[in-house]
Amino acid sequence: MKAFTKITAIVAPLDRSNVDTDAIIPKQFLKSIKRSGFGPNAFDEWRYLDHGEPGMDNSKRPLNPDFSLNQPRYQGAQILLTRKNFGCGSSREHAPWALDDYGFRAVIAPSFADIFFNNCYKNGLLPIVLTEEQVDRLFKEVEANEGYQLSIDLAEQTLTTPSGETFTFDITEHRKHCLLNGLDEIGLTLQHADEIHAFEEKRRQSQPWLFNG
């Protein structure tokens, strides 16, 4: 998992509430359990004018010019700004995979669906909760200023605007540790590999009958 420390990046606005996981990555693209390759189909039904299916050459599909993420000014964005209850709907870890593969490192919203929120942390994507008033202000600034960038410092738990205004956000120490060090659940377990092996050896000596056969 990629570590997250600090970024300064373009912000792309998605001015919709209750964006569900089927909108983030439609169900027909869930046939793979690899974490990569989902980016071209993120927001597929809004992003393209035709209906997408696995195996299609996305470079030849007609883009929807009215979809915000297709606008040239937001190309290369690594921060997604959106509205409340983002990531609602069915549980699918493919949703944060698709956002990550698209190029997003962080998502800012007033609220997130619980399962999606947890899945973000497991996959190196930082979900930031701000108040609706703060999100409204950011939307206005993003839309008024082409190339608008925000700076996110995870260690300090701050988000800074181009004018120098700073917002703070909450995150548990455990989640911060994992993101700062690029540790998913497997990586976190492997940090304790020596202790695990020592425990297994001690148990093998004290209860050898469990290891016969």
Swiss-Prot record:
<keyword id="KW-0456">Lyase</keyword>
<dbReference type="Pfam" id="PF00694">
    <property type="entry name" value="Aconitase_C"/>
</dbReference>
<dbReference type="InterPro" id="IPR000573">
    <property type="entry name" value="AconitaseA/IPMdHydase_ssu_swvl"/>
</dbReference>
<dbReference type="GO" id="GO:0003861">
    <property type="term" value="F:3-isopropylmalate dehydratase activity"/>
</dbReference>
<comment type="pathway">
    <text>Amino-acid biosynthesis; L-leucine biosynthesis; L-leucine from 3-methyl-2-oxobutanoate: step 2/4.</text>
</comment>
<dbReference type="GO" id="GO:0009098">
    <property type="term" value="P:L-leucine biosynthetic process"/>
</dbReference>
<dbReference type="GO" id="GO:0009316">
    <property type="term" value="C:3-isopropylmalate dehydratase complex"/>
</dbReference>
<dbReference type="InterPro" id="IPR015928">
    <property type="entry name" value="Aconitase/3IPM_dehydase_swvl"/>
</dbReference>
<dbReference type="InterPro" id="IPR033940">
    <property type="entry name" value="IPMI_Swivel"/>
</dbReference>
<keyword id="KW-0100">Branched-chain amino acid biosynthesis</keyword>
<dbReference type="InterPro" id="IPR004431">
    <property type="entry name" value="3-IsopropMal_deHydase_ssu"/>
</dbReference>
<dbReference type="InterPro" id="IPR050075">
    <property type="entry name" value="LeuD"/>
</dbReference>
<comment type="function">
    <text>Catalyzes the isomerization between 2-isopropylmalate and 3-isopropylmalate, via the formation of 2-isopropylmaleate.</text>
</comment>
<protein>
    <recommendedName>
        <fullName>3-isopropylmalate dehydratase small subunit</fullName>
        <ecNumber>4.2.1.33</ecNumber>
    </recommendedName>
</protein>
<comment type="subunit">
    <text>Heterodimer of LeuC and LeuD.</text>
</comment>
<keyword id="KW-0028">Amino-acid biosynthesis</keyword>
<keyword id="KW-0432">Leucine biosynthesis</keyword>
<comment type="similarity">
    <text>Belongs to the LeuD family. LeuD type 1 subfamily.</text>
</comment>
